[in-house]
Amino acid sequence: IKMLEDLETYVKWVGTPGKAAIEYLNTWVKLMSPITPFIAEELWSLMGGHGYVAKAVIDKELTRGDHLFEVEQRYVDIVTDDIRSVLEVVGGDTVVVYTLDKELAWIAKKVAEEMLSGAEMSDIIRRLSRELTELGIRQPDRVIRTVHEVVSYLGPEKLIKYFETSKEFDEFSVLTKYRGLIVTRLGLKDLVVYRASDPRAPDLGGRKSRALPLKPGIYATSST
């Protein structure tokens, strides 16, 4: 039942099932084999599987895809909630978000590492404040507290694993990928995603400078 729910969630998020869905179904049938061998073999054959499913090896890439998707899903949940909060105050049906450069994602990674080491908030602030100040980031204490809150929701261990697998966390790419889902969830007419560092992107409402690690700057307006 849980696997079916996960598959349905995946389809809802991405719209059109792709390679990941096929790999997921393949793994599902492999897991069924010891419990319902005859049904599993029949399904395996219908899906074009080679040989006997009982001898098939479960792909380790499934685990990789799972934790990547989970972190991205939680991140999109956070951004969706932030957009919803802005809309409740200013209204509108068109939203523009500005993401921080992926090169600064190390800040979130560093906070996650500190959290896993058992460091207290005061220690994390003390260790990172100078680096953030040297980068020209204002109010480093507030930034670190905000990032700490988001990392707590994403799961520091899962976020570290995400970085180990993908080498980076590109908020722009993630939000662009799930843009359609956010539009549907919030009933928007449009959602535009920019990198805050993009000189070609209009700085609506001065929201470029509001972009923080894992917390994009958000501007809402009405299309009418």
Each model region followed by its residue ranges:
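Acidic, turn-prone loop/beta-hairpin segments
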Residues: 1-81, 101
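C-terminal low-complexity, glycine/proline- and small-hydrophobic-enriched intrinsically disordered tails
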Residues: 51-224
